[in-house]
């Protein structure tokens, strides 16, 4: 084998190893690329029981039920589908019906999302585009979603501190 053939063989082998490594990394990160799944996505993907993922949407009004020993249940909706959630623990201060939420956990065999972490979103202006589009499509969109709060000018400024030069 000549030097040129040996060099080409080494380059080809390194290329194959690199392609396999990139493929393995992308396969491992496939489920982590999406920050969360909406209830409609969960229904369409038929996620098996026990697989961990994040569920995002809006807490369905009228669905919150508080039980004993910090147990709560509620439904998360994206306007197109809803999914029951069970959680045991202290809910965030900003958690309320009609508010954005992200829960982390897994589905049980009955199709209930067993959350071990619940994060409340600050307000509707941070609502995911997919959820906002689904709410608009189904006629559940409120006109005050995404509007600035009274006295708010730009992110992090109120009209009072904007007049002082943003201090």
From Swiss-Prot:
One of its GO terms (cellular component) is plasma membrane. The chain crosses the membrane at residues 8-28. InterPro entries: CcmE, CcmE-like_sf, NA-bd_OB-fold. GO terms for biological process: cytochrome complex assembly. Residues 29-167 are periplasmic. Keywords: Cell inner membrane, Cell membrane, Cytochrome c-type biogenesis, Heme, Iron, Membrane, Metal-binding, Signal-anchor, Transmembrane, Transmembrane helix. It is a single-pass type II membrane protein. SUPFAM superfamilies: Heme chaperone CcmE (SSF82093). Residues 151-161 have a biased composition (Polar residues). The keyword Transcription regulation does not apply. Heme binds at residues 122, 126. The keyword Disulfide bond does not apply. Residues 137-150 have a biased composition (Basic and acidic residues). Residues 1-7 are cytoplasmic. One of its GO terms (molecular function) is metal ion binding. Pfam families: CcmE. It comes from the Bacteria. Residues 137-167 are annotated as: Disordered. Heme chaperone required for the biogenesis of c-type cytochromes. Transiently binds heme delivered by CcmC and transfers the heme to apo-cytochromes in a process facilitated by CcmF and CcmH. NCBIfam families: PRK13254.1-1, PRK13254.1-3, PRK13254.1-5. Belongs to the CcmE/CycJ family. This is Cytochrome c-type biogenesis protein CcmE. It comes from Rhodopseudomonas palustris (strain TIE-1).
């Amino acid at each position: 084998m000549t030097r040129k053939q040996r060099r080409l063989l080494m380059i080809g082998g390194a290329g194959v190893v690199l392609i396999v490594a990139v493929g393995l990394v992308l396969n491992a990160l496939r489920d982590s690329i999406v920050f969360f799944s909406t209830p409609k996505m969960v229904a369409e993907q038929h996620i098996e029981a026990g697989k961990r993922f994040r569920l995002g949407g809006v807490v369905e009004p009228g669905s919150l039920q508080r039980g004993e020993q910090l147990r709560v249940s509620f439904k998360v909706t994206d306007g197109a589908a809803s999914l029951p959630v069970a959680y045991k623990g202290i809910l965030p201060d900003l958690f309320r019906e009609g508010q954005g939420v992200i829960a982390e956990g897994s589905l049980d065999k009955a199709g209930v999302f067993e959350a071990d972490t619940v994060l409340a979103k600050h307000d509707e202006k941070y609502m995911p585009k997919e959820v906002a589009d689904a709410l608009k499509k189904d006629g559940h969109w409120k006109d005050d979603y995404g509007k600035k709060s009274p006295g708010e000018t730009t992110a992090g400024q109120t009209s009072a501190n904007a007049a002082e030069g943003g201090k």
